[in-house]
Amino acid sequence: MEPSATPGAQPGVPTSSGEPFHLPPDYEDEFLRYLWRDYLYPKQYEWVLIAAYVAVFLIALVGNTLVCLAVWRNHHMRTVTNYFIVNLSLADVLVTAICLPASLLVDITESWLFGHALCKVIPYLQAVSVSVAVLTLSFIALDRWYAICHPLLFKSTARRARGSILGIWAVSLAVMVPQAAVMECSSVLPELANRTRLFSVCDERWADELYPKIYHSCFFFVTYLAPLGLMGMAYFQIFRKLWGPQIPGTTSALVRNWKRPSEQLEAQHQGLCTEPQPRARAFLAEVKQMRARRKTAKMLMVVLLVFALCYLPISVLNVLKRVFGMFRQASDREAVYACFTFSHWLVYANSAANPIIYNFLSGKFREQFKAAFSCCLPGLGPSSSARHKSLSLQSRCSVSKVSEHVVLTTVTTVLS
């Protein structure tokens, strides 16, 4: 996404592409007030956009910060997948804190108000965050694919994950340098350039018209089309491995056919029921691992799907604009403006959506989020949830003992 790029100047306002525009000195101040009142002051629907941006800003910053704190404060959550999730959250915090305010002001005022230096820095950081997000999601998919589909080919470790994260940032910072190099700030009303930054534009300047077509075609393929295609194939194989049919009689097949292992595992952990036999315990461990892998895979698939949907509109619009030259003389300019504005917002909404996904699809993250808010809402603390779970387990203990005896006897017979 390009936070500085706008579809064009406001309708009815003279631009540098038209006739020379001159104002008598006495009328400059009056003209600026006129521009602010009729063109720059937010319209009613733009106030809705501002509220949506503010909501995304707060949710993204708070949510992604809590994700980082949850992994940092809990050693049992420092898994390879969670390291990559933290890296994704850091990229979301970066783009939200630095790029979102600029995008909001550009979308509302259609003016670049931050000067020449930030005209290069902010779009560059935006491109870097996109690259980091795509590469991080790709490494997550690759790690899950190896762990589930080919566990003997590659052993993932936390040290390798940290090295991969450093490599992701190094590659992203390097390959996005051209984005900063081509960004320039200019005014569509040069006569007022020394009086105001209104109607200044931060946009790309290329030496030849062919270069942006090549660059943005490659950008779309490398940061969207190709990685999403590869990740889709990886998760398809993961889905088949975790939910597909298995050879009858194998342990994995038994895991799929046994529908209620959670009560027994929780009861054993709390010491409420008798301890099962060693081989049965191994089976229960595999049940737990299978269920955990399913939950993790489901969460990561949702994260990838939301990312693809949120980045699709701006990716397509940028290709249409930069590669095919559309929207330069758009007849219905308000519709084009609305499309670009909504697509910009969707990119930041993705940053806010990720912590929400973790909350609903990951029990560990949900407990940590509840613990973080427990100072304000004591009923949300993990201790309350644990007490409720303990009472529930005690009420089921007698039933669990009987079902455990029957199931474990059957499992032991089959596995012998």
Curated annotation (Swiss-Prot):
It is found in: Cell membrane. Induction: By nutritional state, up-regulated by fasting. Residues 1-22 are annotated as: Disordered. Residues 68-82, 141-160, 236-298, 361-416 are cytoplasmic. Its main location: membrane. The keyword Transport does not apply. The keyword Glycoprotein applies. One of its GO terms (cellular component) is plasma membrane. Coiled coil: none annotated. The record marks 36 as: Important for responses to orexin. Pfam families: 7tm_1. Highly expressed in the brain in the prefrontal cortex, hippocampus, paraventricular thalamus, ventromedial hypothalamus, arcuate nucleus, dorsal raphe nucleus, and locus coeruleus. Not detected in the spleen, lung, liver, skeletal muscle, kidney and testis. Orexin receptor mRNA expression has also been reported in the adrenal gland, enteric nervous system, and pancreas. The chain crosses the membrane at residues 47-67, 83-105, 120-140, 161-182, 214-235, 299-321, 337-360. Belongs to the G-protein coupled receptor 1 family. Moderately selective excitatory receptor for orexin-A and, with a lower affinity, for orexin-B neuropeptide. Triggers an increase in cytoplasmic Ca(2+) levels in response to orexin-A binding. The N-terminal region is required for orexin signaling. This is Orexin/Hypocretin receptor type 1.
